[in-house]
Amino acid sequence: MSKRSKLLKRRMLSLSVICVLIGYGPVFNPVRSQAKVMTYSSENRELPENTKDGVMLHAFDWSFNNIKKELPSIAAAGYKAVQVSPVQGTKSNSTNSSDWWLLYQPTNQAIGNAQLGSYDDFKSLCSEAKNYGISIVVDVVMNHMANNGNDDEVASEVDPSFKDPSLYHHNGQCTDWNNRQDVTQEGIGMPDLNTQSSAVQSKAITFLNQCVDAGATGFRFDAAKHIETDLGLDANKSWSGNYWENVLGSLHNKSNLYIYGEVLQDGKVDNISAYESFMNVEASAYDGSLRGAIKSGDLTNAQGMGGLDSNKCVDMLETHDEYEHNESKDLTDWQRKAGWAIAASRAGSVPLFFDRPTGNIGSEGDALWKDSDVVAVNEFHNAMAGQNEYLRLQNNNKAMIIERGSKGAVIVNEGDSFNLNTPTNLEDGNYDNHGSATDSLTVSQGRMTGTVPANSIIVIYNKNSNPGSDRVTLSEQAAKAGDSVTITYDAGTTALKDASNVNLYWGYDGFSAATSKAMTSLGDNKWQTTITVPKEVTKNVNFSFTDGTSWDNNNGANWNIPLASNYLPHAGYKVDYDSSNLVSGNNFTIYYNGNLANSSNVSLHWGVNGWSNMQNLAMVKDSNGFWEATIAIPASSNTLNFCFTNGSSWDNNNNNNWTLNTWSSVPKVQVTPAPEACKQISVYYNGSLASSASNITLHWGCNGFTSPQDINMVKQADGRWLANITLPSGCYNVNMAFKDQSGTWDNNNSNNYNFSSTNN
């Protein structure tokens, strides 16, 4: 809540009952997004580990459940964090969009309100967000409580624990916004909490820790400027207070929380350097300058950061206050994208994308947050963490280049098409745009050249998750023993350019039985040969290239062709795999014949340990109609996570995805076929009880052991125990444990044995 919104907000309440771091700058091979609005794209992306290195989506007035539903798309769009609207109680259950301000007049300091959802809804959101590596930042209102239509009077709906008069300042409402004491000790249209009071601080600590314990990983403090400090302009003053030291210092998990405050800059009494000692701050002066620059078409004032340290601020084009008070509503979608491209490609700051509301409170807002240009900029920001910036204007100040270190650049052009010719530190090469505009730029001898289209956003950098894939083409992405694989190599950008001969140096399973094979020239620095996969291969075929003197070994990574599985997927099942290969370090083939099977292309989107190291792998359609892809399960994995995309649509198992345990050796529990609701599977057990038991009982259920059942297993000749079960409708997760005749249990050290079940 800002000063500039205060007077208008007060009238509404009565009516309703009331920095540029100079630096210059590996050429990458970007894949252009095809969809204008994306759910996921067919590229590898990985979110930053820390909130401070990523971008934040302000899911303004979205309900907790609507945010949870969109988490897969939010992660795919490159957002590391989601800011939720205030979670505290409200004095009315209205969900009318014009009553958005209700959330900024809290009746308590506890989680749950009629507009966004309950405590359990919030906790469930946080739990699911963790699976995607997404931080949940809560907008909290700690400066004041709800009024009854009269600014100084507490609303009747306010919780009884906040009706004690000693919890409030009684100094009236602020009229002199240039007086620091008035700004912090008087009201801003609502009853002003006595934040020097230990009782008020204790309540704040309890509430904020409730949020943290439920899974919140950060906070935005609304109206932080109106809560005094004991530094700067407040030091040794009668109104000085220790709210921030005591409250922030008492938070659980405090070292891992991302905290920022609304401290609107006025250049006089904002005392902003004091707040920077405790938290990050909104770059309010910069967002005004940026918005003005975008509206005028002269980007000169889009430079700088409004006098703030970019490493201590959250920057944006518009906030909810500015939108709701008509300061930014006139921005077009194109202007919003252009402003976002500048704000989010800057160094140091955490950019906040405000999602404009389109319906009642609780509804999801408009779709611009997942526009292909917005997503391209998000990914650029994530890839540029730690890189300095070099800003310059072009095209009569209608275009800006934000170059980040030596890794990449974003160009925002609000003017007509122009020919670019400017110094750069990017490496020589051709750079395709990651955004929606179809064009490319060339870097040669320290200069970037090309045509920049009118009203365009160009994003150039290297984000290829498989370095070297631009110069190697395989006839088979995975192969079985005895298969022939044709390898085509483009030496045009390598040390082997213009070589008179090129040999394929290849072997298997770490270059065992390595040998060289002469390749055939196709002209234009392209070479080709065909090999037959040996029967001795257990993991993969390895190869690199040489002319006898120079080498191309993919910067030490070499190239690999994984060994495909001999497993035959079961007809009629949407997902299948050989669960005996769920071993860290093994190749693992996933077969897919689900909702996207008739698409022209399907990619496997996968990660490990809760979606770490996410990447996409193109699948190949086999003669049985299944799409298949083979991955090497990382040695560090405990779980494998996956879903499927055709580049514009997703099959994520009705928002449940697929999650499988991985093992360090032969899995103790195997299933075949892969579990699917309403279908039969065979369960094989070879765990700690298997060898000595005279009988084994399978105890199983779905979705957290709902309606558990017991079934006797039958011992097989190979020592494993077998039971066949039919999964019920709605089953998306099969849960299992085992016990022997004496009642001894094997429940996987209280974790049970769990397999995702296809349920769509």
Curated annotation (Swiss-Prot):
Q: Which cofactor does it need?
A: Ca(2+)
Q: Does the keyword Flavoprotein apply?
A: no
What GO molecular function annotations does the UniProt record carry, in alphabetical order? alpha-amylase activity; metal ion binding; starch binding
Q: For this protein, what does the record note about how its cofactor is bound?
A: Binds 1 Ca(2+) ion per subunit.
Q: Which domain of life is it from?
A: Bacteria
Q: Where is this site: Transition state stabilizer?
A: 321
Q: Which InterPro entries match?
A: A-amylase_C (IPR031319), Alpha_amylase (IPR006046), CBM25 (IPR005085), Glyco_hydro_13_cat_dom (IPR006047), Glyco_hydro_b (IPR013780), Glycoside_hydrolase_SF (IPR017853), Ig-like_fold (IPR013783)
**Which Pfam families does this one have?**
Alpha-amylase, CBM53
Active site located where?
222, 262
GO BP term, pick one: carbohydrate metabolic process
Q: Which residues form the signal peptide?
A: 1-34
Q: Does the keyword Metal-binding apply?
A: yes
EC number(s) recorded for this UniProt protein: 3.2.1.1
Class in the EC hierarchy, top level: hydrolase
Q: Which residues bind Ca(2+)?
A: 143, 184, 192, 226
Catalyses which reaction? Endohydrolysis of (1->4)-alpha-D-glucosidic linkages in polysaccharides containing three or more (1->4)-alpha-linked D-glucose units
Its keywords, alphabetically, are: Calcium, Carbohydrate metabolism, Glycosidase, Hydrolase, Metal-binding, Plasmid, Signal
Family from the record = Belongs to the glycosyl hydrolase 13 family.
State how it assembles. Monomer.
Q: What is this protein called?
A: Alpha-amylase
Q: Which organism is it from?
A: Clostridium acetobutylicum (strain ATCC 824 / DSM 792 / JCM 1419 / IAM 19013 / LMG 5710 / NBRC 13948 / NRRL B-527 / VKM B-1787 / 2291 / W)
